[in-house]
């Protein structure tokens, strides 16, 4: 089913195809349905299905999923005599891994914020970055238990910057939602760089961080640069919600992180 939206004569025409299937089943009968999706094309969905679900064997994929989750969850081992507390810990760890999510077909193709199809070559593209919520704890955790994924996440940020002119704030499947405040891709990038994680282009990362921090017409950044804080009683074209104190704190922290990255790279003139 093709649910792609089409832009025609300045109007967005969405097919928004939905389907419902009714089956006449008998009591105890089981149905096995294999599905696939793609953010790129119908053909991409077919390739994803062929690559990821070549057999109609539910138990096989259930076992593979369980093995994969155990592999990731076992990266932290705890000693605890209380089973309930152990269940709580690993349930919380599981929840921490539900996002960010891979956003690409099996061949690396994905739909970018510039409305074009791109291909991640040698890395995995990620999306669903709720950065205002996750930069404080989740992403630092990933640097210890999922460093390879952190490298791919930073590369995803930099690709987003190349395609959209700024780092993501709260990107979701090829688009920017602009939910919440700050530009918290920055501390995620800087944390990875200072810990020596990955092979991403650190110079490009610094460029992206500085460019994002200098979007004067975005959510009071120009006012913040002018005054050293975001005034509570002044708005700009993108500052209607104000939140002056929160923005000042978030911008100050992100800018501190940029300074640490510049220091690490020997860039004293940033």
Q: Where would I find each of the regions flagged by the language model?
A:
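Extracytoplasmic/secreted proteins, especially bacterial periplasmic and envelope-associated proteins
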Residues: 64, 68, 84-91, 136, ...
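Second-shell loop/turn segments in exported
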Residues: 51-58, 74-80, 127, 138-143, ...
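Secondary-structure capping and boundary motifs in well-ordered enzyme cores
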Residues: 84-85, 124-133, 177-185, 247-251
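Acidic/polar, glycine-enriched structural segments that form the non-catalytic walls/loops
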Residues: 1-125, 159, 166-169, 198-214
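A conserved hydrophobic secondary-structure block that centers on an alpha-helix together
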Residues: 14, 79-82, 124-128, 135-140, ...
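Active-site acid/base region of carbohydrate-active enzymes
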Residues: 87-101, 105, 162, 175-180, ...
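Alpha-helical support elements that line or immediately flank enzyme active sites
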Residues: 91-104, 127-150, 190-196, 256-266
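Flexible glycine/proline-enriched surface loops and loop-helix/loop-strand junctions
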Residues: 121-123, 134, 138, 173, ...
């Amino acid at each position: 089913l093709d649910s792609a939206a089409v832009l025609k004569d300045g109007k967005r025409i969405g097919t928004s195809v939905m389907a419902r299937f009714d089956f006449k089943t008998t009591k105890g009968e089981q149905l096995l349905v294999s599905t696939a999706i793609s953010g790129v094309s119908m053909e991409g969905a077919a390739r994803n299905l062929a690559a990821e679900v070549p057999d109609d064997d539910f138990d096989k994929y259930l076992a593979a999923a369980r093995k994969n989750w155990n592999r990731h969850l076992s990266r932290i081992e705890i000693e605890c005599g209380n089973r309930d507390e152990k269940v709580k810990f690993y349930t919380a760890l599981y929840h921490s891994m539900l996002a960010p999510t891979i956003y690409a077909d099996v061949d690396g193709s994905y739909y970018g914020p510039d409305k074009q199809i791109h291909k991640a070559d040698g890395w995995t593209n990620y999306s669903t970055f709720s950065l205002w919520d996750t930069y404080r704890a989740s992403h630092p955790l990933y640097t210890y238990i999922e460093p390879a994924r952190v490298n791919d996440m930073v590369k995803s940020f930099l690709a987003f910057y190349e395609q959209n002119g700024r780092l993501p704030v709260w990107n979701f499947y090829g688009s920017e939602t602009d939910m919440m405040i700050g530009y918290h891709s920055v501390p995620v990038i800087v944390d990875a760089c200072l810990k020596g994680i990955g092979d991403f282009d650190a110079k490009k990362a610094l460029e992206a961080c500085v460019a994002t921090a200098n979007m004067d017409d975005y959510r009071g950044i120009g006012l913040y640069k002018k005054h050293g804080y975001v005034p509570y009683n002044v708005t700009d074209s993108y500052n209607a919600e104000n939140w002056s104190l929160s923005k000042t704190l978030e911008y100050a922290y992100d800018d501190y992180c940029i300074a640490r990255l510049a220091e690490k790279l020997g860039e004293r003139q940033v």
